[in-house]
Amino acid sequence: MQDTTLEVRLAELESRLAFQEVTIDELNQTVTAHELEMAKLRDLLRLLTEKVKATQSSHMASPSEETPPPHY
């Protein structure tokens, strides 16, 4: 009787292990995909930041070139 109980418990543990291995593989794939996406987004953010800085510096006058605001 005890051997049957041990066999059932062992089978249950093996089943859980198999499901855990599948889950770990899926999570690993998800993490890898997210890392690639984050790298692309970092590159895009860097590019957009450079474009915004270039646009701001070319379209905005320096404070010394600005005319003073009218006084009331």
Swiss-Prot record:
Pfam families to which the protein is assigned, alphabetical: SlyX
Compositionally biased intervals (Polar residues): 54-65
InterPro entries: SlyX
Residues covered by region (Disordered): 53-72
Assigned protein family: Belongs to the SlyX family.
NCBIfam families reported in the protein's UniProt record: PRK02793.1
Stated name of the protein: Protein SlyX
Name of the gene: slyX
